[in-house]
Every structure is written in structure tokens, then in C-alpha cells.
Amino acid sequence: MSMPQAILTDIEGTTSSLSFVKDVLFPYARRALPDFVREHREHPDVMPWLDQVANETGTAFSEEALVATLQTWIDTDSKHTALKALQGMIWASGYQNGDFTAHLYPDAVQRLRAWHAANVPLYVYSSGSVPAQQLFFRHSHAGDLSGLFSGWFDTEIGGKRESTSYQRIAEHIGIAPAGIVFLSDVIEELNAAAQIGLNTVLIDRRDDYPTPRHLKDADHHLHLDSFAQLPF
């Protein structure tokens, strides 16, 4: 596989550990939700998302009901766009207050910097909201890496397991699918990207998956333990 025209990467389990998201970010948002909803429910950036949750679930627009719904979604790792937007707002305070800094694998940091130096455009596609993605890379253990990226995509462009989402991303960045490499630890996402012609790499880190995964369709993708093994 030669140097691609652009690289699209997932975050959780790919550039960064699963445990940071599940053991630090998710519990932080869950704890903060009651106060956040009470203090910001009338804020113009918050109210539309709470309205969406209430309308979609038939939940009465009460603080208690909304918080209970959102906390259940956190517990089940829902990818709902409204939840991700609200989580991002909560995490912003955590980053700014120094409550935590984002984890990035050293091999990912090294390769991201090298690709940027080689003028390869880098993009993020994550279920987390675009503001949350930007905060993640701005407040990392390796410093502010947000400037390495040319663009950011979340589920507002479509679900990560839907091939049409990757078609929209390719059209947005103006590069044919065959010129893009997508990096992820989720086989269903890679399958969707491959359907429209993206080159795909399954990242199967031992820190996140102690036993190598033998997944259906894994042979359809380059299967590596880390960014250090990437051939470009």
C-alpha cells in the first residue's frame, strides 16, 4: 500500500485507548449530566438537543426524565448525535479545568505528525461530535495536535456503519475513494468504507484487545497491531 492522498481515522481504539473513553470520559459526562441540564437547559446551544431527545423518545420535557434517558444512552454506548453533542459540551469543561487530558498512543502521534509533515491531509471520523473531537486532540498527553488535521466528521454526515457516509466524506474532501485510507478498530465500519472503494486498515491493538481478533471479513482489510506497522 503506497502513500495515500488522504488519511481518515477513527479515535477510540485506533489513535487512542478504549479505556480512556469508557473509564474516564463516559463516567465524567454521566456524573455531570444532572447539573449540566439544570444549569444550561435554556441555553441556545443546549435546548435544541434536549428538545430532540424529548421529541424522539416521547419523554416529558423534565430535567429528571431527560437526564435518565441520556444516562441510559451513555450506559449502552449509544451513538445518538444529541448525546454526543451534549457530552462534548460537558467534556469541554473537564478539559479546560484540567480534570483530564486525552490519551493518544505514541505510535499514532508519531505517524500523524509524520504524515502532516509530508503534506498528507488528515481527517477524523468519529461518533463523538466534531467539537469533542477537536477538544480531544487539543488537550492530549502529547500536546495540542488539532492543527495536524484538515477536517472533522461526526455522525451528522451519517452513521459510521453506512457506506453512504464514506461517499459523502470523499465528496466533501474532493478525493476519490481509492485515494483515501480509513483506519479503525471496528470491522463493520471498515466494511462500509470498503464498499465504496476506500482502502481500509483494521487496527487491532493488544492494549485494547489482549487476544488477536479473528473477525469475519477481517481478511478484506489490512490487519495490524499499531500505526507503527503501517507501510506508508
UniProtKB/Swiss-Prot annotation:
Binds 1 Mg(2+) ion per subunit. Its EC number is 3.1.3.77. Keywords: Amino-acid biosynthesis, Hydrolase, Magnesium, Metal-binding, Methionine biosynthesis. Pathway: Amino-acid biosynthesis; L-methionine biosynthesis via salvage pathway; L-methionine from S-methyl-5-thio-alpha-D-ribose 1-phosphate: step 3/6; Amino-acid biosynthesis; L-methionine biosynthesis via salvage pathway; L-methionine from S-methyl-5-thio-alpha-D-ribose 1-phosphate: step 4/6. It catalyses: 5-methylsulfanyl-2,3-dioxopentyl phosphate + H2O = 1,2-dihydroxy-5-(methylsulfanyl)pent-1-en-3-one + phosphate. It comes from the Bacteria. The keyword Ligase does not apply. SUPFAM superfamilies: HAD-like. Its cofactor is Mg(2+). GO terms for biological process: L-methionine salvage from methylthioadenosine. Bifunctional enzyme that catalyzes the enolization of 2,3-diketo-5-methylthiopentyl-1-phosphate (DK-MTP-1-P) into the intermediate 2-hydroxy-3-keto-5-methylthiopentenyl-1-phosphate (HK-MTPenyl-1-P), which is then dephosphorylated to form the acireductone 1,2-dihydroxy-3-keto-5-methylthiopentene (DHK-MTPene). Monomer. Belongs to the HAD-like hydrolase superfamily. MasA/MtnC family. This is Enolase-phosphatase E1. The lineage of its organism: Bacteria, Pseudomonadati, Pseudomonadota, Gammaproteobacteria, Lysobacterales. The gene is mtnC.
